[in-house]
């Protein structure tokens, strides 16, 4: 059984499909600059909202065609900082697309998970609207 993860970021909305052993099967990236609206105006324009909805509906169609039963839509900084993200989420819910906006701390925790087995190392995630840094020093995550 395959699983799909959709990353709704500040500069692009991308998906990755993994097989049951979490090997990457497919990757797709569509540049859609949510951060352009959010970081300059504080909210998403109507046209941008419509683009997001259309794109996520097309992703959902792909997942159904590929018989992917488990998929997750995750949003980060742009929707976290957006004054009208609730409007977008409500419009998506009507279409059975449930988006989870994760906190910066959650992003950092995910990095920590990636980095936990590599002592004396650092992982840096430079996104369009935030930066998360995870340091593993003497097997302690910071």
Feature roles, as predicted:
Residues 129, 133:
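Active-site-adjacent helix-turn-beta-strand microarchitecture at beta-sheet edges
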């Amino acid at each position: 059984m395959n699983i799909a993860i959709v990353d709704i970021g500040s500069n692009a909305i991308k998906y990755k499909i993994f097989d049951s052993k979490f090997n990457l099967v497919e990757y797709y990236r569509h540049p859609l600059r949510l951060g352009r609206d959010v970081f300059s105006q504080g909210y998403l324009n109507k046209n941008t909202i419509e683009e997001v909805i259309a794109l996520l509906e097309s992703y959902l169609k792909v997942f159904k065609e590929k018989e992917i039963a488990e998929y997750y839509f995750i949003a980060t900084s742009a929707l976290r900082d957006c004054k009208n993200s609730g409007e977008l989420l409500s419009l998506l819910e009507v279409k059975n697309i449930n988006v989870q906006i994760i906190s910066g701390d959650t992003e950092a925790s995910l990095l920590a998970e990636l980095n936990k087995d590599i002592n004396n190392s650092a992982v840096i995630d430079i996104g369009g609207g935030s930066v998360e840094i995870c340091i593993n020093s003497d097997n302690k995550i910071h």
